Each structure stands twice: as structure tokens, then as C-alpha cells.
């Protein structure tokens, strides 16, 4: 199945000169959504994964069905103030400054093998901060899986050395 047909490209959104890659059409089509989830599940199958971690919000949309299919747990990564218990945090660079991500301090147990799942790999800032938190908790990042990679934004460089699966590539 050619998943590229299920990604909408919106020019000049959220600002002039940016092309936003919208996964909503993929999610709206049951066959395409199921296919994408199965592709990530297949990627994870031989990695002995204990936990899926997904950054908000679209990492939840992709990561939760993968966790369900594998019969394992899901741990959310959120912006500050969104998680109710003790958290750890990591900062990352955005185009216009620093931002912060958090996860529960007990979300990952030492030695757990983790697959990070998100919708999009662009600059790699979000996934790099997520990796930092998982490793701070003693987890092992067994891989990273994305629906879309924006080529030319150097996201792969940010996660060099980590096994990565991407289902679709688009210009950045």
C-alpha cells in the first residue's frame, strides 16, 4: 500500500514557507491506518520491546495501537504541567528557542527495552529529548519508528546510532 497517498500537504502552514504534512487522512482510512500500525508492529516484533513511548499528541495516535497490538504498555511524553505525578524532563531546541518535555519518573524501569513511536521525524529535537529521558530512567532505546520523515531537516543526525524505521519520506 502506498501510504504517501494518505498524507495531505498543506502549503504555508503553520507559517509562510512551511509545508505541513497532515496524517489525518491516513487515520481516517481504516485500511491505511491499520497497514501503518502493522508495519511498525512488524518492525518491533524481533526487538523484544517492553514498552512503547510516544510524544504528545500524535505519538499517542500512532503509539497506542502499536502497544495494544504487541500486548505491552504505553508511556506518554507530555509538555510540562500535563502529567499528575512526579516527572523528569528534558529540554530541546525548536526553531524559535527552547521547549521542554516530561514523562513520569516511574514510566520506565531500568533495563526495559523501549520503542519510541511518533508521527513525524523533522529536526529530531523531540525524539532526542525523549531518548534522554528514557536513558536517564535506565531504559534501553531499542528503536524509533515514525510514519513520516522530512528529508533535509537532519532528524536522522540527531538520533544517529539508534535503529530507526520510517514509513514515508517527504521533502523538508
UniProtKB/Swiss-Prot annotation:
Major localisation: cytoplasm
InterPro entries noted in UniProt: Ade_phspho_trans (IPR005764), PRibTrfase_dom (IPR000836), PRTase-like (IPR029057), UPRTase/APRTase (IPR050054)
PROSITE patterns listed in its UniProt record: PUR_PYR_PR_TRANSFER
Catalytic activities: AMP + diphosphate = 5-phospho-alpha-D-ribose 1-diphosphate + adenine
Cited CDD domains: PRTases_typeI (cd06223)
One term of GO molecular function: adenine phosphoribosyltransferase activity
Keyword entries, A-Z: Cytoplasm, Glycosyltransferase, Purine salvage, Transferase
Source organism, top-level taxon: Bacteria
Pfam families: Pribosyltran (PF00156)
Annotated GO biological process: adenine salvage; AMP salvage; purine ribonucleoside salvage
Subcellular location: Cytoplasm
Keyword Cytoplasm attached: yes
EC number(s) stated in the UniProt entry for this protein: 2.4.2.7
Pathway it works in: Purine metabolism; AMP biosynthesis via salvage pathway; AMP from adenine: step 1/1
Gene Ontology cellular-component annotations: cytoplasm
Subunit composition and interactions: Homodimer.
Alphabetized HAMAP family for the sequence: Aden_phosphoribosyltr
Free-text function comment from the UniProt entry: Catalyzes a salvage reaction resulting in the formation of AMP, that is energically less costly than de novo synthesis.
NCBIfam families per record: apt (TIGR01090), PRK02304.1-2 (NF002633), PRK02304.1-3 (NF002634), PRK02304.1-5 (NF002636)
Family: Belongs to the purine/pyrimidine phosphoribosyltransferase family.
Name of the molecule in the record: Adenine phosphoribosyltransferase
Amino acid at each position: 500500500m502506498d501510504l504517501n497517498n494518505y498524507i495531505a500537504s498543506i502549503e504555508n502552514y503553520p507559517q509562510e514557507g512551511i509545508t505541513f504534512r497532515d496524517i489525518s487522512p491516513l487515520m481516517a482510512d481504516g485500511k491505511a491506518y491499520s497497514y501503518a500500525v502493522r508495519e511498525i508492529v512488524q518492525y518491533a516484533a524481533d526487538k523484544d520491546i517492553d514498552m512503547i513511548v510516544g510524544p504528545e499528541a500524535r505519538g499517542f495516535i500512532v503509539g497506542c495501537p502499536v502497544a495494544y497490538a504487541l500486548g505491552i504498555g504505553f508511556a506518554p511524553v507530555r509538555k510540562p504541567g500535563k502529567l499528575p505525578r512526579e516527572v523528569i524532563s528534558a529540554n530541546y531546541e525548536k526553531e524559535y528557542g527552547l521547549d521542554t518535555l516530561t514523562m513520569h519518573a516511574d514510566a520506565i524501569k531500568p533495563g526495559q527495552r523501549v520503542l519510541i513511536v511518533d508521527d513525524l521525524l523533522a529536526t529530531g529535537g523531540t525524539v532526542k529529548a525523549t531518548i534522554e529521558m528514557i536513558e536517564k530512567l535506565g531504559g534501553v532505546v531499542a528503536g524509533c519508528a515514525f510514519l513520516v520523515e522530512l528529508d533535509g531537516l537532519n532528524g536522522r543526525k540527531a538520533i544517529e546510532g539508534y535503529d530507526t524505521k520510517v514509513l514515508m519520506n517527504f521533502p523538508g
